[in-house]
Curated annotation (Swiss-Prot):
It is an enzyme of class 5 (isomerase). This is Glutamate-1-semialdehyde 2,1-aminomutase 1. Its cofactor is pyridoxal 5'-phosphate. The modification N6-(pyridoxal phosphate)lysine is found at residue 268. SUPFAM superfamilies: PLP-dependent transferases. It catalyses: (S)-4-amino-5-oxopentanoate = 5-aminolevulinate. InterPro entries: 4pyrrol_synth_GluAld_NH2Trfase, Aminotrans_3, Aminotrans_3_PPA_site, PyrdxlP-dep_Trfase, PyrdxlP-dep_Trfase_major, PyrdxlP-dep_Trfase_small. The gene is hemL1. Homodimer. The lineage of its organism: Bacteria, Bacillati, Bacillota, Bacilli, Bacillales. Keywords: Cytoplasm, Isomerase, Porphyrin biosynthesis, Pyridoxal phosphate. GO terms for molecular function: glutamate-1-semialdehyde 2,1-aminomutase activity; pyridoxal phosphate binding; transaminase activity.
């Protein structure tokens, strides 16, 4: 493949856009650098770049394009919004319809509020939890990404009883001191942290199924223990379901796992590709939010007709019979094919998969936490990424990210991808 136009456009972008990209995850820095491919069109499971190259897409915009690019039902909803007005600044009937759909799908959402992104949703759930409890500290888990607000860009201290340190320039140490970070899937470290800080903890923030250092499932009893220990200390539990909501079933990962949080943050996937976020939970906690309570949250774009109509259409698609069975069937086919080629080539490969989402780790060990994910071979992944790109397979440019299958992918797409994996593995 030739990427002449992509390279030219990247040089131009560097003159006008910081780093040439509008999100660091779009950079190829983690896979050896170079110009990222500039995409021009997307349809179904496919991308076409500015040089005319076609790709099977497993990025799916980091998850939300679960129905496939330009799905006709979602596209029609967006057209309807364009014709009737995309932003009102007033209540609309559509936001009520959408709120009811979310509540019916995820029973723990007794009340909801729309925002514009997953970052906003997480940020606000923390504020609401602080307002409800009168406390300031939060506990989160190592390697889990919860957006780019100051309070969640905090790295772990030297141990479970140690406060965090800033994980980004511009985050004051005073904010990092409000965060305790512990390893995912480690109940005893969490218990130790709560024994030390529990009386000051407003909330425990957790991905019920990790999506941000790869697809990682909770160990049996882990989420139940978080609820028990947190509630014993008077802290709330917040689930970040920005990636997991509606990805594995019609509802949240909490439905699938049978464990309910006090508050839930959502984003990405519920908008069908348009910017949106939402948060919700127990009514008595949500009544802390203005105009009913003292916790302020507002947004001109929140609940805008375009995003809400696209979200309604997306959930209508996902509610159809056989949707998640299709994703699971193709996911299993892809996983089996990848592992078969890895065995044939003698490569250290572990695949973590749940239904239509998976992560390929270049390691022999089972990946259940962030440190194990870190030990996955990044140099090997970088070579693999570029070999796959040359064969027309678009993956996220990071060893930590998931491959996302959409409703638009077919068995032929998966078969082609498995063949490409085999060719790539033989060159590693």
């Amino acid at each position: 493949m030739q990427w002449t136009k992509s390279e030219q456009l990247y040089k131009e972008a560097l003159q006008h856009i910081v780093g040439g990209v509008n999100s660091p995850s779009r950079s190829y820095k983690a896979v050896g650098g170079g110009a990222p491919v500039v995409m021009e069109r997307a349809q179904g499971a496919y991308f076409w770049d500015v040089d005319g190259n076609k790709y099977i897409d497993y990025l799916a915009a980091y998850g939300p394009i679960i129905a496939g690019h330009a799905h006709p039902h979602i596209a029609e909803a967006i057209r309807r919004a364009a014709e009737t007005g995309v932003l009102y600044g007033t209540p609309t009937p559509h936001e009520i319809t959408f709120a009811k759909m979310l509540k019916e799908a995820i029973p723990s959402l007794e009340k909801v509020r729309f925002v514009n992104s997953g970052t906003e949703a997480v940020m606000t759930t923390i504020r609401v939890a602080r307002a409800y409890t009168g406390r300031s500290k939060i506990v989160k888990f190592e390697g889990c990404y919860h957006g780019h607000s100051d309070l969640v860009l905090v790295a772990a201290g030297s141990g479970p009883s140690t406060l965090g340190t800033p994980d980004s320039a511009g985050v004051p140490p005073s904010i990092a001191q409000e965060v305790i970070t512990v390893p995912y899937n480690d109940v005893e470290s969490f218990r130790e942290a709560m024994n030390v800080w529990g009386e000051q903890v407003a909330a425990v923030l957790v991905e019920p199924i990790v999506g941000n250092f790869g697809i990682v499932l909770p160990k049996p009893g882990f989420l139940e223990a978080i609820n028990e220990i947190a509630h014993k200390e008077g802290a709330l539990v917040i689930y970040d379901e920005v990636i997991t909501a509606f990805r594995f079933m019609y509802g949240g990962a909490q439905n699938l796992l049978g464990v309910e949080p006090d508050l839930t943050a959502m984003g990405k996937i519920i908008g069908g590709g348009l910017p949106i976020g939402a948060y919700g939970g127990r009514q008595d906690i949500m009544e802390q939010v203005a105009p009913l309570g003292p916790a302020y949250q507002a947004g001109t774009m929140a609940g805008n007709p375009a995003s809400v109509l696209a979200g309604i259409a997306c959930l209508e698609v996902l509610k159809q019979e056989g949707v998640y069975e299709h994703l699971d069937r193709l996911g299993a086919m892809l996983e089996e094919g990848i592992l078969a080629h890895a065995r044939q080539c003698g490569l250290p490969v572990t695949v973590n998969r749940l239904k239509g989402a998976l992560t390929v780790f270049f390691t022999d060990e089972k990946v259940e936490n962030y440190k194990q994910a870190q030990r996955s071979d990044g140099e090997l992944f970088a070579k693999f990424f570029k070999l796959m790109l040359k064969q027309g397979i678009n993956l996220a440019p990071s060893k930590y990210e998931a491959w996302f299958i959409t409703l638009a992918h077919t068995e032929d797409d998966i078969a082609y991808t498995i063949d490409a994996v085999g060719k790539a593995f033989r060159q590693l």
